[in-house]
């Protein structure tokens, strides 16, 4: 786990970012990829390195879960078990290389007063009702027992509905831009060049 960066506005009792990097990346390989999607190059750095750089820039504590678990639920449970004293958790799939540090901090700040925080991105010109759920999803310490009991591929959907969850609007297309296929990687490359 990384320590906090004192130059950032870190929320009191900051949650730990759980970077989930356990997946096999089969869709990426099936789409023509020649390496694991997290090792694919995007603007001269790997997809994983972009995600790590954003997390490090946020100043929040973090943990990478890359042990090769069979499902997302198993990965989340393992990561929470390795960070038992965290004030909460931001669950961030490692294949979101365009996520912005400010988004991580925005979710962390909102988590201070809520059990679960669901970031949502609204595309330009769209109404808030058309918001797309994104990442990272924030979970307060109150969710710990349920997160530790997760398994399989469903992730934390069951935990989300068991607690009071709020939606927040984030101004970050990176919160919904994951890399699952070679086409996704090409789209991310175009978006990265436009920054």
Map each language-model feature to its residues:
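Short alpha-helical oligomerization interface
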Residues: 33-41
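Short beta->alpha junction loops
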Residues: 64-70, 173-174
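A short, N-terminal amphipathic alpha-helix
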Residues: 45-64, 78-82
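Short glycine-rich anion-binding loops that position phosphate/pyrophosphate groups of nucleotides
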Residues: 23-26, 69, 94-97
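Short aromatic/basic micro-patch
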Residues: 41, 98, 138, 178-179
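Active-site oxyanion/phosphate-handling segment shared across diverse enzymes
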Residues: 143-195
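N-terminal nucleotide-binding beta1-loop-alpha1 segment
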Residues: 1-30
